[in-house]
């Protein structure tokens, strides 16, 4: 699922990225980059993969497939990591989130566009090979995903969520409704 609606400004330059048709720029990449750095911007990033991993061995599975210590993440924390093969060759980069609202240990793994199927298959294969107790679910087609970035992001989102965003730092997350949707 994505927003899959044409941009309001039909002059947006479109591109195919990982099988997803999306706007790559509206005005200019330089102008948009500066706007996000100085204020805030929102992006439909539904083309990014969304894989959840939960269960007693979830952190162990992700820890063996990424370069960071996923088990060190507290609920509500995230980390940037590389995904490598057995020889240490980098396959992809990712952000791994330890979800805050889960009763059990649950992580959200975000592979790059078009890599979710390969990452999912790899997780399943290694889970079986290593005999780990973890549930792996590819949720890429289930949810739209919007990134809101920039220093004014809390102000932009503040009116549409009851979550206190002022206490969040880089690579931290909170669970809650945005514009009435969980």
Model-derived segments and spans:
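Basic, glycine/lysine-rich polyanion-binding surfaces/domains
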Residues: 1-182
């Amino acid at each position: 699922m994505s927003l899959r609606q044409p941009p309001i400004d039909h002059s947006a330059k479109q591109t195919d990225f990982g099988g997803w048709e999306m706007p790559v720029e509206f005005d200019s990449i330089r102008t948009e980059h500066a706007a996000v750095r100085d204020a805030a911007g929102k992006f439909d990033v539904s083309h990014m993969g969304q894989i959840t991993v939960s269960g007693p061995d979830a952190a162990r599975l992700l820890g063996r497939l990424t370069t960071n210590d996923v088990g060190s993440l507290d609920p509500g924390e995230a980390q940037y990591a590389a995904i490598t093969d057995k020889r240490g060759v980098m396959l992809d980069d990712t952000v791994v989130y330890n979800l805050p609202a889960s009763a059990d240990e649950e992580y959200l793994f975000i592979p790059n566009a078009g890599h979710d199927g390969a990452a999912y298959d790899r997780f399943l294969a290694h889970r079986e090979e290593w005999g780990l107790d973890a549930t792996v679910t590819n949720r890429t087609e289930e949810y739209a995903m919007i990134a809101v970035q920039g220093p004014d992001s809390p102000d932009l989102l503040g009116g549409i969520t009851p979550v206190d965003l002022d206490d969040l730092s880089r690579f931290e997350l909170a669970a809650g409704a945005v514009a009435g949707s969980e």
